[in-house]
Structure formats: structure tokens, C-alpha cells
């Protein structure tokens, strides 16, 4: 049992780091009610609800079926890559960057192998960038946006007006980089298993409608979570097991850590000083080290400039492999495949990310 627990924490490095930070933070501030008060239950309930709904759609094959249908008329390797990258970009806005990659990267690997294409690195790397940058346009595109939205720091319109220009430039560059692949003709296998029973589609369609009401803040987050939990327990219990509870636990640990930091006056004063100077730069650089979701949770209480924070953590998903949890997901999925060239993947990933980060920072400089 102990061995399995240790293996789990070795595998989930981000959660392990978050837990260590939370425990060490008790040296700054002894455990008290402030740590419980620091846990943002609205964000956790929304995140749980959205992950459950998307897991339901994935489980019944709906996302896979849509993806295969959209690639049905593709006849070239270049076209296949462009369609999959564009799908990642668009899907990430609706179901989060993590889920977009969990759905489309395995499908990409499958389709490329069926076409006789062994090297998928270029396409998977571009899909990862597409998911990270496409997701920043909407409040539900990634966990850090959802946190800033549910905590009342930014509105849906704020995300759109602030980040859409960056996303548009990123999409154009992504499509241009797809042109580097050859126009080699391929035969794409688009056969797909039929989705599950219609009652599942009705269930998750209804829950999606409730989620839209919760996102619009018409329905309380707890009411959505209750409906999701009761609905899935009654009709589709298997979906509950597919929710990413590791991400939820990571959020809880960082909420506890942030509560300790806020209660420690010297550390609080230092962070406020740093964030007052350049919130975007601090957020971006912090993301490179601890990933952009934890960076957002850590830095949010210490700045009033939520837009600069959002820009910093969203663009901060570019750069290092650990800058975004979604990037680690892609790397794991690719690395688990037969004949994976992890060293080459890392080199291509780093080069492409540096390129996009330079372009995005150049655009930011032009807009300021």
C-alpha cells in the first residue's frame, strides 16, 4: 500500500510539489481556520462539474466521433496535421486545454500510425501550443482562467478582448507551421465506434445547459455540482471515476499554501512589491518554474491588475515543459507510444515554444 502511494506521488509531481508547499507553509502560519477559509469552494465545484461533464462526453465517444468526422475529407499529411491542430485550438476553448489534448493527441497518434506515418512529434507539439493558446480566450478554457472568472476578477468579455488578438496571431502562426509538413497523400481511417445510449447524450446535454447557466452566474456553483453528482451517480457512475481528482487536490493544496503566505506579513509584503513592479513578467516567469495554474493561485491575492496576471499566466504556459500541466499531458501521451523519441520531442517542443513566446511577447510590447 505504501509503495503504491509513493509511486502515485512520484508520478504526480505537480501534486507532490503542491502538497509539500502546503505542509511547509504551516511553518509560516500554524494550521488554523484561515486555511479553510482560503479554499475557494466555488472554483472547486465549477471545476469538478465541468470535468465530469466533459468526461461523460469523452466516455461515450462523442468528442472522438466529432473529431473523426471532421477529418473524413482530409487527403494529405499536411491537411491532417492542420485539421487536428485547429481542432485542438477550438476544442480547448470549450472543454479546457487538458481535455482537448487528452482527446485529440491519442487520436492523432492513432490516425498517423494508420496512415503509415511514424513521426508525429511536429503535429503533437503544435497541438499542445494550440490547446494552451486557444484555451486562454474563454473563462472555461483552462483552470487559471476559471479561477480568475469565478473569483470575480475578470469577466468573459475581459478574457475575449484581452486575449483574442494573441490567439488570432497564434492560430495564423500554427497554420503556417503546418505548411512545413509535406503534402504527401494519406488515407485517413475515420471509422469510429458509435456513441453510447441516447439517454447519456440527453444527460450530458442537460448538464451542459446547467453549466452555461452557472458560468453566466445565474445558477450557483453548488447547485450545478449537486445536479452533476446526482445525475451521473444515477445514470453513469463510471464517469465519476474518470474525473481528474489530482487537479482538484492540487488546487486545495495551493489554496492552503496561499492562505499561509497571505497571513505571513514579510512574505506578503515582498510579493506585493514584486507584483506592483511588473505583474505580467512575474506571473510569466513564475509559471516557467511551478506551472501557470499554481502561479495564478499564488500571485492572484497580491495584485489588483487581474488582466496583467491573466496575460502573464496564460502566455506563461509557453516556454518550459512544466510551464503548463497540459504540456506534460501531451509529453506523457506521446512518450507512452511505441518508438517514442523523447529527447527529440523535448528539443522540438522547446524550440517551438520559444518561438511562440517571443512572438506573443512582441505582440504584448506592441499593444502596450
Regions found by a protein language model. Name each.
Residues 41-43, 72-85, 114-123, 199-202, ...:
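Membrane-interfacial loop-to-helix junctions in multi-pass transporters
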Residues 116-183, 187-193, 330-360:
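Membrane-core helix-loop-helix motifs of multi-pass transport proteins
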Residues 160-171, 281-368:
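C-terminal transmembrane helix pair
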Residues 4, 68, 180-205, 237-241:
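Flexible interhelical linker loops that connect adjacent transmembrane helices
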Residues 38, 60, 64-69, 207-304:
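Transmembrane helical segments that form the transport core of multi-pass membrane transport proteins
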Amino acid at each position: 500500500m505504501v509503495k503504491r502511494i509513493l509511486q502515485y506521488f512520484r508520478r504526480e509531481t505537480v501534486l507532490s510539489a503542491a502538497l509539500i508547499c502546503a505542509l511547509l507553509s504551516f511553518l509560516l502560519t500554524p494550521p488554523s481556520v484561515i486555511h479553510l477559509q482560503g479554499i475557494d469552494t466555488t472554483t472547486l465545484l465549477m471545476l469538478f462539474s465541468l470535468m465530469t461533464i466533459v468526461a461523460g462526453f469523452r466516455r461515450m465517444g462523442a468528442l472522438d466521433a466529432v473529431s473523426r468526422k471532421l477529418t473524413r475529407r482530409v487527403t494529405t499529411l499536411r491537411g491532417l496535421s492542420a485539421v487536428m491542430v485547429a481542432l485542438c485550438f477550438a476544442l480547448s476553448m470549450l472543454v479546457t486545454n487538458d481535455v482537448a489534448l487528452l482527446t485529440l493527441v491519442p487520436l492523432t497518434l492513432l490516425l498517423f500510425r494508420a496512415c503509415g506515418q511514424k513521426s508525429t512529434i511536429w503535429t503533437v507539439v503544435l497541438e499542445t501550443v494550440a490547446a494552451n493558446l486557444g484555451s486562454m480566450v474563454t473563462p472555461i478554457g483552462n483552470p487559471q482562467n476559471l479561477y480568475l472568472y469565478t473569483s470575480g476578477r475578470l469577466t468573459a468579455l475581459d478574457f475575449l478582448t484581452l486575449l483574442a488578438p494573441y490567439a488570432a496571431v497564434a492560430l495564423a502562426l500554427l497554420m503556417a507551421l503546418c505548411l512545413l509538413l509535406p503534402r504527401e497523400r494519406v488515407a485517413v481511417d475515420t471509422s469510429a465506434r458509435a456513441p453510447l445510449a441516447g439517454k447519456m447524450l440527453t444527460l450530458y446535454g442537460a448538464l451542459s445547459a446547467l453549466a452555461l447557466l452557472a458560468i453566466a452566474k445565474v445558477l450557483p456553483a453548488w447547485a450545478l455540482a449537486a445536479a452533476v453528482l446526482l445525475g451521473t451517480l444515477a445514470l453513469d457512475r463510471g464517469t465519476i471515476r474518470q474525473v481528474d481528482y489530482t487537479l482538484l487536490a492540487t488546487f486545495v493544496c495551493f489554496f492552503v499554501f496561499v492562505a499561509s503566505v497571505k497571513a505571513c506579513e514579510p512574505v506578503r509584503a515582498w510579493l506585493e512589491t514584486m507584483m506592483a513592479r511588473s505583474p505580467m513578467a512575474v506571473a510569466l516567469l513564475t509559471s516557467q518554474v511551478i506551472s501557470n495554474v499554481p502561479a495564478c493561485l499564488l500571485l492572484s491575492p497580491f495584485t489588483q491588475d487581474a488582466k496583467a496576471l491573466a496575460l502573464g499566466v496564460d502566455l506563461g504556459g509557453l516556454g518550459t515543459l512544466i510551464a503548463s500541466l497540459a504540456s506534460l499531458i501531451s509529453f506523457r501521451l506521446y512518450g507512452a507510444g511505441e518508438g517514442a523519441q523523447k529527447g527529440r520531442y523535448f528539443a522540438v517542443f522547446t524550440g517551438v515554444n520559444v518561438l511562440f513566446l517571443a512572438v506573443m511577447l512582441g505582440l504584448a510590447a506592441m499593444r502596450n
